[in-house]
C-alpha cells in the first residue's frame, strides 16, 4: 500500500506548489490584444519582458508612421517575438504591423501569413479580415475578398470601410441589389442625377413616375426594386436595368439605357422576328408596343392550324398615366379538335374527335404596391359549345355543358425572400377564380392555385448555370367547364408543363392528362454554350414531376408522372426565344421532341 500512497502524496504537493503561479500569470500579449480580445497566456513572460514588448510596439508604430517598412518587418519577425517571450502569432498587434509593412513592400504572401496569424490570435479583431480582403482583391481573388469582408462585417456590421469595399465589389459584378444592401448601411449611394440616354419615345411624365427615387436622395434597395418592377410592367423595354456611376465628389449618377421592344413598324428584321416566329406551327404574332408614346401595347395571335384555330388580342395601358396601375382588355376566340381517347374515362367509346368552340372576353387591372408585391383582378365572360362528345356517367355531362359563364379572377405575387449577395430569390403567388355557368342545374365553382419560384445564379456575374425550381398546386371546388380544367403537359396554350408529355397527338389537343386537382414541380439548370452579337444559346437539363386527379375519376393521371431531358433556348437579338425540348417519360420510357417560341 505504501508504495502507491507515497507517490500520490508527492504528486498532490507538487500540484499545490504550481497552482498559485498559474492562476496569477498575465502575458504581454493579453495586454496588447486589440478591442479586449483574449490572447493565449504565456507563463514564461516576466514583468520586464512585458515592458519591453510595450516599448517595442511603440517603436514599431513610429517606424511604420515614418515609412520604414523593412525595419518594421525586421522587428516583428517570429524570432523577435520569441526574444520577447511571446508565442508565435500570439501578439496580434505585432502581426498586424508586420502584415501592413509587408503589404507596403508588396510582399503579399508574407503579409497574408501575418494577417492570418493575427486573425487566429484575435478572432474578434475586424482589422485582419479587412486587410486580408484587400490582399485578395489586389490578387484578383474577388470571391475570397467578399468572404473576408463578410467576416469583418460579422464582427462590426456598421464598419464604413468594409461596407463600402464590399458594395463596390458587388457593383463591379453588376449586382446592384447586393451593392445597395451594404451601401445603404452607411448612407450611400446619394444620387446626384438620373440620366436616360438615349431618350425613349415615351411620355416623359410616365417615365418620370416610373422611378421610385429622385436626385438628391439615397438610393435604397427597396426603391431600386420598385423601379425595376414598374419599368418591367410598362412592357415597352427589353430587360430594363439601372446602373450607377461614381463621381469624384462621392455621389453617384443613376443611368438608365432604354432598349425599346421592337414590334411591328420597326426594322424589317424586327418585323420578321415579331410577326413570323410562330410560322413553323402555323401562327403569327402581330404585336405593337408603346402606341402613341404612352406605353399602350397591343398583342395578338393568329393561328390557322385546322385542329387549333385561334384569334386572340389584348390591349394594355397605364391607368390615367400612372405606371403603377395598368388595365388590360382581351378577346379570345378558338375552335379546337380534341382527342380524349386516352384521357377521358367515362365514355362508352373513345372520344377522338370532340370539337370545342369558345369565345372569351374580359377586363383586368394590375397594381404594383412596391418592388416586393403586386396584385391583379379581373372579370371575364365566356361562351362555349361542345360537339361530338358522349359519356356513360351522367355526372360527366356537367363538364361538357354548353353555355355562358361569368368568372371573377384575382391574384397576388410577392417576393418572399431575397439574398442578393448570393443571387438567390424566392417568389410566391396565389390566385383564385370564382365562376358560374349559366345553364340548367349548374352550380358555382371556384379554382385556386398557389406556387413558389426559386431562382439561383451560382456565379458572381452572368447567368451561367442559372438554376430554377418551381412548385405549383391547384384545386377546384364544384364542377368547372371542361375548358377550365387543369392540364399537365407541353402545349403552347398551357403553362403547366411536363416536358416529356406532349399535349397534342396528330395535331389534336387532349393527349396530356387533365383534372381538377394537380401538383407539379419543375426544375432546370442552364449553361450558356454559345453567344455572339446576334444570338445566345443556352442548354441544360430539366426534371419535372407531377400528378393530376379528378374526384369523379373521369380524368386524371392515375399515378405520379416523372419526366427528364434537355432543353435548348436560343435568344435572338435579346428578344424572341426559340425553345427546343428533348424529353423522356421515366414511367413509360417514351421519348418526346417539341419546339416552340416565346416573345419578349
Predicted regions and their residues:
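C-terminal outer-membrane beta-barrel translocator/porin domains of Gram-negative envelope proteins
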Residues: 405-537, 541-542, 549, 592-599
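Compositionally biased, proline/threonine/alanine/serine-rich low-complexity intrinsically disordered stretches
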Residues: 21-55, 62, 66, 84
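Bacterial N-terminal signal peptides
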Residues: 7-16
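Alpha-helical segment of the N-proximal tetratricopeptide repeat
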Residues: 53-85, 93, 97-106
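Gram-negative/organellar outer-membrane beta-barrel architecture
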Residues: 223-428, 490-505, 511-515, 521, ...
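Periplasmic polypeptide-binding modules associated with outer-membrane biogenesis and secretion
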Residues: 103, 116-127, 134-277, 284-288, ...
Amino acid at each position: 500500500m505504501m508504495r502507491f500512497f507515497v507517490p500520490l502524496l508527492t504528486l498532490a504537493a507538487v500540484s499545490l506548489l504550481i497552482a498559485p503561479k498559474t492562476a496569477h500569470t498575465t502575458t504581454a500579449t493579453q495586454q496588447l490584444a486589440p478591442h479586449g480580445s483574449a490572447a493565449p497566456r504565456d507563463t514564461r513572460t516576466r514583468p520586464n519582458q512585458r515592458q519591453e514588448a510595450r516599448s517595442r510596439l511603440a517603436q514599431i508604430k513610429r517606424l511604420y508612421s515614418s515609412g520604414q517598412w523593412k525595419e518594421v518587418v525586421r522587428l516583428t519577425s517570429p524570432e523577435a517575438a520569441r526574444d520577447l517571450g511571446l508565442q508565435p502569432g500570439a501578439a496580434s498587434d505585432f502581426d498586424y504591423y508586420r502584415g501592413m509593412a509587408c503589404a507596403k513592400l508588396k510582399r503579399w504572401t508574407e503579409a497574408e501569413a501575418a494577417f492570418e496569424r493575427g486573425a487566429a490570435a484575435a478572432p474578434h479583431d475586424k482589422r485582419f479580415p479587412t486587410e486580408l480582403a484587400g490582399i485578395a482583391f489586389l490578387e484578383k481573388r474577388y470571391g475570397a475578398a467578399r468572404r473576408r469582408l463578410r467576416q469583418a462585417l460579422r464582427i462590426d456590421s456598421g464598419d464604413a470601410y468594409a461596407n463600402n469595399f464590399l458594395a463596390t465589389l458587388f457593383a463591379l459584378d453588376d449586382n446592384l441589389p447586393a451593392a445597395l444592401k451594404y451601401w445603404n448601411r452607411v448612407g450611400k449611394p446619394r444620387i446626384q442625377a438620373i440620366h436616360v440616354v438615349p431618350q425613349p419615345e415615351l411620355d416623359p411624365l410616365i417615365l418620370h413616375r416610373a422611378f421610385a427615387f429622385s436626385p438628391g436622395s439615397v438610393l435604397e434597395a427597396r426603391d431600386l426594386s420598385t423601379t425595376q418592377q414598374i419599368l418591367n410592367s410598362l412592357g415597352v423595354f427589353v430587360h430594363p436595368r439601372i446602373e450607377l456611376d461614381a463621381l469624384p465628389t462621392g455621389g453617384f449618377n443613376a443611368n438608365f439605357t432604354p432598349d425599346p421592344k421592337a414590334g411591328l413598324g420597326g426594322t424589317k428584321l424586327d418585323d420578321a422576328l415579331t410577326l413570323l416566329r410562330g410560322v413553323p406551327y402555323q401562327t403569327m404574332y402581330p404585336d405593337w408596343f408603346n402606341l402613341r408614346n404612352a406605353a399602350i401595347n397591343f398583342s395578338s395571335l393568329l393561328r390557322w392550324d385546322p385542329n387549333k384555330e385561334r384569334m386572340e388580342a389584348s390591349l394594355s395601358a397605364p391607368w390615367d398615366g400612372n405606371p403603377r396601375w395598368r388595365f388590360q382588355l382581351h378577346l379570345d376566340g378558338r375552335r379546337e379538335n380534341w382527342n380524349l381517347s386516352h384521357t377521358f374515362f367515362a365514355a362508352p367509346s373513345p372520344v377522338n374527335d370532340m370539337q370545342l368552340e369558345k369565345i372569351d372576353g374580359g377586363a383586368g387591372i394590375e397594381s404594383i404596391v412596391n418592388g416586393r408585391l403586386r396584385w391583379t383582378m379581373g372579370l371575364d365572360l365566356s361562351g362555349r359549345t361542345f360537339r361530338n362528345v358522349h359519356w356513360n356517367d351522367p355526372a360527366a355531362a356537367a363538364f361538357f355543358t354548353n353555355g355562358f359563364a361569368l368568372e371573377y379572377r384575382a391574384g397576388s405575387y410577392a417576393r418572399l425572400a431575397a439574398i442578393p449577395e448570393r443571387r438567390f430569390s424566392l417568389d410566391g403567388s396565389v390566385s383564385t377564380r370564382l365562376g358560374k355557368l349559366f345553364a340548367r342545374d349548374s352550380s358555382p365553382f371556384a379554382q385556386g392555385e398557389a406556387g413558389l419560384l426559386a431562382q439561383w445564379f451560382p456565379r458572381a456575374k452572368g447567368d451561367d448555370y442559372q438554376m430554377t425550381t418551381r412548385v405549383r398546386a391547384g384545386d377546384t371546388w364544384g364542377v368547372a367547364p371542361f375548358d377550365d380544367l387543369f392540364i399537365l403537359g407541353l402545349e403552347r396554350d398551357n403553362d403547366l408543363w411536363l416536358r416529356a408529355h406532349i399535349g397534342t397527338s396528330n395535331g389534336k389537343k387532349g393527349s396530356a392528362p387533365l383534372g381538377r386537382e394537380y401538383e407539379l414541380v419543375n426544375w432546370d439548370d442552364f449553361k450558356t454554350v454559345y453567344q455572339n452579337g446576334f444570338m445566345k444559346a443556352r442548354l441544360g437539363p430539366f426534371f419535372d414531376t407531377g400528378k393530376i386527379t379528378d374526384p369523379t375519376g373521369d380524368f386524371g393521371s392515375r399515378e405520379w408522372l416523372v419526366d427528364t431531358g434537355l432543353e435548348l433556348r436560343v435568344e435572338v437579338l435579346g428578344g424572341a426565344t426559340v425553345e427546343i425540348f428533348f424529353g423522356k417519360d421515366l414511367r413509360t420510357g417514351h421519348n418526346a421532341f417539341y419546339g416552340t417560341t416565346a416573345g419578349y
